[in-house]
Amino acid sequence: MTFSGKVDLSAADRLFDWSGVHVVIAGLGTSGYAAADALLELDATVLVLDDSDDDSHRDKGGLLEVLGAEVRLGPGSASDLPEETDLVVVSPGWRPTQPLVARALTRGIPVWGEPELAWRLMHPDRVIPWLAITGTNGKTTTTQMTESILHAAGLKACAVGNIGRPILEAMADEINYDVFAVELSSFQLHWSNSLSLHSAAVLNLHQDHLEWYAHESDPLGSYAADKARIYHQVTNSCVYNVADPATEHMVEDADVVEGARAIGFTTGTPGPSMIGIVDGLIVDRAFVEQRATSAMELARLEDVHPFAPHNVENALAAAALTRSFGVPAPAVGQGLRDLHLGGHRIETVHQAGGITWVDDSKATNPHAANSSMRAFEHIVWIAGGQAKGTHFDNLVTTHAGKLRGVVVLGTDRGIIARSLAEHAPQVPVVVIDDMSREAMARAVHEAAKMARPGDTVLMAPGCASLDIWPGYAARGEDFANAARHVDGPDADG
C-alpha cells in the first residue's frame, strides 16, 4: 500500500483500504463536512481545519468529532500541514498558493476537491452517471434545467456540486439515483483529475475569478484550462457553444473515450450534430437517426423562462445533455415548463409608474451583466462590488446607447465609474461611497430619480457581493425590498 514511504492513492476508490490514511479536510463548509463524513465511514484518520469559529462551524465540528474526526477551528488553524498527511481535500475556492495547499503540493501530497473524492468513492455496483456543466455564466440555471428535464422523463435525478448540495451527500441518500446533474466550478475542476463523465458542457468562457489565478503567467489561459478539464475522458457527448469558439477548441483538444461525440448548441439554425432553433422551436439534429436531413422538435421558445437570449442558450445546453442520456423529446419542453428558478436571476421584483425593477444579483461578472443587459432596451443600471480582476470597458461600450443612467457602489465602484467616464461620458453616473448595506437603498433612490416610464432599473452588478453582503442573495433581497417602496418616476418629487 506504500509508495516512496507514502500511501499511494493514485488508484484509491471505495474498495481501497482507507484505514490508517491520514486525510486533512481544508475547510468545514458543506462540501468539507460531506468529505469528512464519507472518509470517516471508510475508517480514514480525518483532521478538519478551518480558520472560522462561528456557531455553524462549531456545530458541524462537534458532530464530526463524535464520529471520530479531529477538528481544529479558529484563526490560524488552517495554516499548518501536519507531517503525517497523506491526502488533502480542499473546499471550493482554496487556491494553490494558500500556505497549507502549497506545502502539500511541494511535498507531493495529492490535493483533491469534493467532486474528485466523490467520483472515486462511488460504489462499483452503483455507478451514477454524471451530466456536468461548467462555464463562466449560466451554470446553476443550466444545472437546474437539466435536473428538471430528467425529472420530466421520469428519472431519479439530483442537482449537485457547486449548485449547493455536495455530491457525496447525494450519494449517501437511500434514493438509488439514475443520474446526477452536476455543476462544476473552475476551482473544483482544478482539483479533479480522474473524472470520466457521461456528458459535459462548457457554456461559455469569459474573464472571471482571475484573482484566483493571479500567480499564473497567463491567468485567463489557466482559468480556461481548468474549465476544459470537464471534457477529459467523457464517454458520450462533449457539448459546446457554437457562438463561443473557445469552447469548441476545448472539445477539439480533449482526450475523450473513443466514440464520444462533439455536440454544438446554437441560437441559430443547427447543423448536423447540433441543437438549435428553427421557427421559434428548439430542435435536435444531434440525437436523431437522420440528422443530416431532419430535425426533431424538443420545445418551444416560450417554454424557456425567464426569457432572455442567454437563458435560451442555457436551455439548449440542458437539452443537449439530457438528450445525450436518452431522454425522450417531449420531456425537454415539459422539464423547461416545470422549472421554477430561484430568485435573483433576471427577476422582476417591482413595477410602478411604467418602470420595471429587475434583480439580477446573480450577475457577478461583466459577461453575466452583459447577458442581462441584452434583454432590455432602456436601462438605469445599478452596478458594482468586487470586480475580481475583471474589466468593464467592453460592457460599457456595448450598452452605452441604452443607458439612461448608472449608479455604482461597492469596493470596485471606481473601476466601473472610470470605464463609464471614458466610454460613455454622456451617461449620468452616481457614485455611492457608503460601504454598509444601506448603500443599496441609496442606490435604488438615485436610480428612481433617473428612471422614466418604459425604463428598466436593472441591478446586474457585474461583481461579487462579499464586500458588503454575505452573498448575492442578500444583495438581491436588499434591492427588492428597496425597490418595492418606490412609487414611480422621480418618486421623491
Swiss-Prot record:
Subcellular location, record wording: Cytoplasm
Enzymatic reactions: UDP-N-acetyl-alpha-D-muramoyl-L-alanine + D-glutamate + ATP = UDP-N-acetyl-alpha-D-muramoyl-L-alanyl-D-glutamate + ADP + phosphate + H(+)
Enzyme Commission number, as recorded: 6.3.2.9
Chain residues that bind ATP: G135, T136, N137, G138, K139, T140, T141
GO biological process: cell division; cell wall organization; peptidoglycan biosynthetic process; regulation of cell shape
InterPro entries: Folylpolyglutamate_synth_CS, Mur-like_cat_sf, Mur_ligase_C, Mur_ligase_C_dom_sf, Mur_ligase_cen, MurD
Pfam families: Mur_ligase_C, Mur_ligase_M, MurD-like_N
This protein's name: UDP-N-acetylmuramoylalanine--D-glutamate ligase
Primary gene name: murD
